[in-house]
Amino acid sequence: MSFRLQPAPPARPNRCQLFGPGSRPALFEKMAASAADVINLDLEDSVAPDDKAQARANIIEAINGLDWGRKYLSVRINGLDTPFWYRDVVDLLEQAGDRLDQIMIPKVGCAADVYAVDALVTAIERAKGRTKPLSFEVIIESAAGIAHVEEIAASSPRLQAMSLGAADFAASMGMQTTGIGGTQENYYMLHDGQKHWSDPWHWAQAAIVAACRTHGILPVDGPFGDFSDDEGFRAQARRSATLGMVGKWAIHPKQVALANEVFTPSETAVTEAREILAAMDAAKARGEGATVYKGRLVDIASIKQAEVIVRQAEMISA
């Protein structure tokens, strides 16, 4: 049978994931005090090779020593193609304690990549008697990753989220751009003699969303590199939200408020969703499967759409 129930994703806010390099511990307290739902302390791209060991020590000290409040606390480890990743996993699991919620696995190209990390994590958890299972977020940032996105989404019960890493993805795909997310000047459509810029990421985002929703995982948009362009960030985030993504990375503190703004349902949207649910309740009481709301048809499928908005708003306000 082709039909199966679609599992629900983790019920936690994930509007903004704020990144900070492990080599800059002075930033950690500010990150902990930010309005981001998720904190990603980074051991990968933002840390120079010679600084990896010290960055790892900085992060472990901060996880154990700082008050992170209700933040979902994550560490991006180094890629499996480096000599650093296993030490990242071993030291974090053995030294960081239960406050660590998640590790982010970069450059995942197939399910076996996730399995390799899962096997190591599971062995350490058993050896240490860790009772809180560590969750995973993976980053799709290669042609192989997007080609195998569904098998990756199904690869581990630890997997809670999946992001698109735009820069490495663009390089792997041979895309002619140096931009990180957002619209690209040479990627446009012609309409009435004018250019209407689009972005080359939406098809990959849609593939990630479909795989995530099939397997009960949170789909997350990746970085927007130009942190001087607030409107560009908002526009990219709105497109991602429309596709079904639940949040976006922030690579600069000023992007946190922008992400929270876009991925928090507005009062108008929530009110309209509740009104649609009420209208459909009234229709069902009359024995009808559809009704008219503000001049447009709403039916049973509209209930599901409205419930998505209401659930998201209630989860954020809880």
From Swiss-Prot:
Keyword Glycosyltransferase: no
Alphabetized Gene3D superfamilies for the sequence: Phosphoenolpyruvate-binding domains
Regulation: Inhibited by EDTA.
Top-level EC class as recorded in UniProt: lyase
Keyword Oxidoreductase annotated: no
Cofactor: how and how many bound: Divalent cations such as magnesium or manganese.
One term of GO molecular function: magnesium ion binding
GO biological process assignments: oxaloacetate metabolic process
Residues bound to Mg(2+): 141, 168
Cofactor requirement: Mg(2+); Mn(2+)
Highest taxon of source: Bacteria
Family: Belongs to the HpcH/HpaI aldolase family.
Role noted for this protein: Involved in the ethylmalonyl-CoA pathway for acetate assimilation. Catalyzes the reversible condensation of glyoxylate and acetyl-CoA to L-malyl-CoA and the reversible condensation of glyoxylate and propionyl-CoA to yield beta-methylmalyl-CoA. It is also able to catalyze the cleavage of (S)-citramalyl-CoA to yield acetyl-CoA and pyruvate, although this reaction is not involved in the ethylmalonyl-CoA pathway.
Oligomer status and interactors: Homohexamer. Dimer of trimers.
Protein name: L-malyl-CoA/beta-methylmalyl-CoA lyase
